[in-house]
Amino acid sequence: MRFERPSLVESMGLSPPRERFRQAMIALRGDEDVPPSRYDASSLKLLDPRLSIPLWRGRYAVHRQVVLTNLFNHRQTPIELGWSVQRTQVEDFRGKASTYDSHNGTDFAVPRGTPLLAPASGVVVRVVSEFHRGGLKLAIDHGDGLITSSAHLARVLVKEGDRVRRGQHVGITGYSGLDSFVTFPWGIPHVHFNVWLDGEPVDPFARVAHPEEQSLFVGGRPTPIPRDVEAEEPRGSDYDPARVDAIVAACITPRVRARLASIEPLLMRGGHTIFEKNYYPTRFPDRASPLREVHARRPRLHLPFSADLFDGAVFQDEL
């Protein structure tokens, strides 16, 4: 396995330009049901040329290491106020401040053109490019209520409905989306990695202050996928059709409500609904779980990268 070399246009997701401009205006001005994004001088702390320059050039920032930059924020500001890249109230799983206000995922900083692998077996439930919300994104339902979403990609190699195995090559990383465009070349190319359990965003790391909490990473820490990994059979989650339809019916945006209601089969409708209500939470007053059962945290995920290219992960604030 080797690094690819996507163009800057593909890496940043700039095409088609007219549509990207329209989407950029949503982030800056807001929409009928989406408040504008919030940023200030504290947002400049997200820039780091010592990491960004080599990664944009397709090289390691730290040899054979994934750099963990922004972590899941356990003190997120109300999303009704708008997506915030400010740092006003932040706490990562270690009790430190490597995150920002609205960050509900984990950022894996890797060289542009890194092969993206499936972190566990599952079914592809969403592929979409939205310049104002994370660029090109790929979501996989791994069964038992667990979905992962990888954002800021340059290219996706699978389609919705595909069944993929742990370690399968599913995409190529870049840094697509508006934040890349406005911060180039000081913004750090990365994969924004969301984990949703029973429809809600969760931190894949176990909180240090909660020793009873289980990590979602295999072995308790983020490790790349070995070439000879044993891959389980792909399957999706067991959705309750009445619960899914109730969440969709409560959506306040008519065009989104109609699109979700038309999706078949149930697995895809459930996956699309979870994806939509997490990327656009102000559209969904009903936050109930769409799953038939409640699922506990357990170690199921690898880093979505190959052990051929990476040995492990390091924290940006410890470099």
Specify the residue positions occupied by each region the protein language model found.
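Surface-exposed, glycine-biased beta-strand/turn segments
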Residues: 2-135, 179, 220-319
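Short amphipathic beta-strand/extended segments with alternating polar/hydrophobic composition
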Residues: 64, 80-89, 150-153, 201-211
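Small beta-barrel nucleic-acid-binding modules, principally OB-folds
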Residues: 98-108, 142, 195-202
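Residue-level detector of conserved, well-ordered beta-strand and adjacent loop positions
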Residues: 109, 141, 151, 174, ...
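Solvent-exposed coil/turn segments that connect beta secondary-structure elements
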Residues: 113, 121, 129, 143-145, ...
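Short, well-structured beta-strand-loop connectors
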Residues: 115-126, 158-173
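Zn2+-dependent peptidoglycan hydrolase active-site motif and core
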Residues: 119-157, 178-190
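Conserved, short, structured surface segments that act as functional micro-motifs
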Residues: 138, 162-235
